[in-house]
A protein has these predicted regions:
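Active-site and adjacent substrate-binding regions of carbohydrate-active enzymes
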Residues: 1-211
């Protein structure tokens, strides 16, 4: 429907590709597409359904997609094939933190890029807590329980303990900044600069405010 926001299912995979290849080439193309087409999107890193890959066809070369599938499998991700056909990948069930090699630095950078991406950021709770792949939950589930890898039920004690970690506090600081800085407005002007494939600058401006 006209005027409705849509989920940006491209961003998670394009960002992972950018990190692996140290190049923002394909992500930059998509950012410019969002801006020129005036798309209204909700962006995310991980979600309850894993990391979508089928959506990347046409944006990423097939070999880059398959390379990413293999990388995430080595990091504990479980591949969901379309209609059960192994050659027809659909999504990788994996926490975003594990997809990033469980690197605090990459997780924080991913969150920073997310809040500066065009659109409205949505946060999956397990990403915020830097959750790792929950293999035990998958084993306890039925044959279709692959999604449980990214749906850990945190206890109150686990949540409180995680809140004390730097990676969680740093993400919360970024989210507070996104929610309170006047530069991030629905009517903001977003400028994109990239002087080299490994460099990307996103600037939001609204009235006298910029970020």
């Amino acid at each position: 429907a006209t005027g409705c926001m849509t989920y940006d299912f491209f961003f998670p995979g394009l960002l992972l590709d950018a990190f692996e290849h140290q190049s923002f080439e394909y992500l930059l193309f998509w950012i410019n597409e969002i801006l020129t087409q005036k798309l209204k999107v909700v962006n995310m890193l991980g979600c309850h359904d894993g990391i979508p890959l089928l959506d990347l066809k046409g944006l990423l070369p097939e070999e880059r997609i398959m390379e990413m599938v293999e990388i995430l499998k080595k990091r504990g991700g479980l591949v969901k094939d379309l209609h059960g056909v192994q050659s027809m990948y659909y999504q990788v069930n994996c926490t975003y933190f594990s997809a990033l090699g469980e690197s605090d630095r990459k997780m924080l950078l991913a969150r920073a890029l997310q809040i500066f991406m065009p659109g409205k950021p949505q946060v999956w709770y397990l990403d915020l807590f830097a959750g790792k792949n929950d293999i035990d939950a998958v084993k306890k589930a039925n044959s279709n329980g692959h999604k449980e890898i990214n749906r850990t039920n945190l206890t109150t004690d686990q949540a409180i303990s995680s809140l004390q970690t730097d990676i969680v506090q740093d993400q919360l600081a970024l989210l507070r900044f996104r929610n309170t800085c006047p530069a991030f407005s629905w009517d903001s002007n977003i400028q994109v600069q990239s002087t080299a494939s490994h460099q990307l600058t996103l600037t939001w401006s609204y009235q006298s405010h910029s970020a």
